[in-house]
């Protein structure tokens, strides 16, 4: 699969072009929503704010900073949005799923504005088609590791000096818990329950609180790491994973954790290994070894087993399905003979 093409388009200079009036309108909407759901201020709303900035830069450059509430915008909204879709495709090289999210970001602003009485109608509601096939579009590679590959990583992390104890912990806890990287980045010493081998009340996607469970080996690593931390920051930083910046220890960012995961993937010769691959590997491994899809869904904090089935279980080849059918038939025949 081809590498994802990254474009740095939205520089400080371009963002400075955004109309102050348009910025003021969106900030009012954003603050209103943050008040209702502060838990996702630095996650979901940060993404939406960034996407809206991109749209406002587009308006500044292509539509002379047209006012978001102006009659001209209302009249030309469909043309504006279709042009923005083309811009996202041709200039930013966004995939379909990202483009749909960007459209939803703008649409949500107008839905709020309509409820508040700032406008009389939504300018493009039901007039635009969402990008089709977004869910089927493969954006990044997914790797489902087998036992041999998982063991190779675990053993290499123990012996290769270029990896440290935090690398071991990230790999081990992610594999044990099958949690998202967002939860892993928020692990704290205060939330740690060593006796029950779990981190409690960790805020994850959209502010939901989850548990992050781990096994015996991870427990050993955590104990070792906490002893080391006494000599580093005397456990003053509550975050489990830390980095040193400007002479001070602070919480390790999600981006730094992902960089470490990418480095771990190089053990297997994978240069595009990402945190979600570990999550998928863990959940798929549960299903393969237990045959219980609901158990995998529960571990993944999924509300529906269909989410687990469609996105976290390794698709079987026709040959694998055939072999499975043959084995099932053989078992049925053996059972009949015994009867």
Predicted stretch roles:
Residues 27-140:
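N-terminal core-binding DNA-recognition domain of tyrosine recombinases/integrases
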Residues 1-11, 326-339:
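C-terminal secondary-structure termini that scaffold catalytic or DNA-interacting sites
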Residues 204-224, 237-260:
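C-terminal catalytic core of Y-nucleophile DNA break-rejoin enzymes
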Residues 203, 300-326:
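Catalytic-site neighborhood detector that most strongly recognizes the C-terminal catalytic loop/helix
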Residues 151-181:
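Basic, Lys/Arg- and aromatic-enriched nucleic-acid-binding interface segment
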Residues 91, 135-163:
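Long, amphipathic, Lys/Arg-enriched alpha-helical "connector/arm" segment
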Residues 172, 279-302:
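C-terminal catalytic core of tyrosine-transesterase DNA break-rejoin enzymes
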Residues 192-194, 271-272, 291-311, 334-339:
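Short, polar N-cap/turn motifs at the start of nucleic acid-interacting alpha helices
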């Amino acid at each position: 699969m081809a590498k994802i093409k990254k474009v740095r388009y939205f520089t400080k200079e371009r963002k400075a072009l955004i109309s102050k009036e348009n910025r003021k309108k969106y900030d009012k909407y954003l603050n209103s929503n943050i008040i209702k759901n502060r838990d996702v201020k630095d996650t979901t709303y940060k993404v939406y704010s960034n996407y809206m900035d991109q749209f406002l830069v587009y308006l500044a450059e292509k539509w002379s900073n047209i006012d978001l509430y102006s009659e001209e915008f209302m009249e030309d909204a469909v043309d504006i949005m279709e042009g923005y879709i083309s811009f996202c495709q041709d200039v930013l090289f966004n995939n379909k799923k990202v483009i749909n999210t960007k459209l939803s970001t703008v649409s949500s602003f107008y839905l709020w504005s309509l409820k508040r009485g700032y406008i009389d109608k939504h300018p493009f509601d039901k007039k635009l088609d969402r990008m089709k096939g977004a869910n089927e579009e493969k954006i990044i590679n997914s790797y489902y590791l087998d036992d041999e590959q998982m063991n190779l990583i675990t053993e290499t992390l123990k012996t290769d000096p270029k990896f440290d104890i935090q690398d071991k912990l990230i790999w081990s806890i992610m594999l044990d818990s099958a949690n998202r990287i967002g939860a892993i980045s928020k692990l704290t010493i205060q939330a740690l329950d060593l006796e029950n081998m779990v981190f409690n009340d960790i805020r994850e996607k959209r502010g939901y609180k989850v548990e992050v469970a781990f096994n015996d080996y991870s427990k050993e690593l955590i104990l070792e790491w906490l002893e080391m931390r006494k000599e580093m920051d005397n456990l003053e930083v509550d975050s489990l994973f830390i980095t040193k910046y400007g002479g001070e220890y602070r919480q390790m960012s999600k981006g730094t954790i992902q960089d470490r995961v990418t480095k771990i993937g190089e053990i297997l010769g994978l240069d595009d290994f990402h945190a979600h691959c570990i999550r998928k590997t863990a959940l798929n491994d549960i299903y393969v070894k237990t045959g219980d899809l609901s158990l995998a869904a529960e571990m993944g904090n999924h509300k529906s087993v269909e989410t687990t089935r469609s996105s976290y279980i390794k698709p079987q080849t026709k040959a694998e399905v055939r072999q499975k059918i043959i084995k099932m038939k053989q078992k049925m025949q053996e059972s009949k003979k015994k009867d």
